């Protein structure tokens, strides 16, 4: 997980890599993620900005998230959830991630 603050982003923590502008103190409400560059189609991966992913196998963070941001090139095979400043850092190592099929996976979050 990461916070939209200068120490963890670039000089514009309220603007994500796809150009989306956020309200920093409401970051946890968006359900956005940043992915490592190797996972983005632009660099040969399988995800694109705007794609939805289903995250499962976490402790309280399972759900549907939208790809909106990317990470420094030093990170590989990683997805970070965007959280508001003040949210205590957490980490998952065995989470499962798949690209969402919106026709089926929307049922997952509404039931």
Regions inferred by a protein language model and the residue ranges of each:
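Solvent-exposed, well-ordered loop and adjacent helix/strand elements within mature globular domains
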Residues: 1-111
């Amino acid at each position: 997980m990461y916070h939209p603050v200068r120490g963890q982003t670039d000089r514009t923590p309220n603007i994500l890599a796809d150009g989306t502008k956020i309200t920093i103190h409401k970051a946890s409400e968006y359900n956005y993620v940043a992915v490592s560059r190797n996972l983005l189609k632009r660099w040969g991966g399988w995800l694109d900005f705007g794609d939805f992913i289903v995250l499962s196998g976490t402790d309280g963070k399972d759900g549907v998230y939208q790809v909106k941001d990317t990470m420094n090139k030093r990170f590989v095979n990683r997805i970070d959830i965007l959280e508001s400043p003040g949210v205590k850092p957490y980490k998952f190592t065995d989470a499962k991630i798949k690209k969402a099929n919106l026709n089926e996976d929307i049922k997952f979050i509404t039931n």
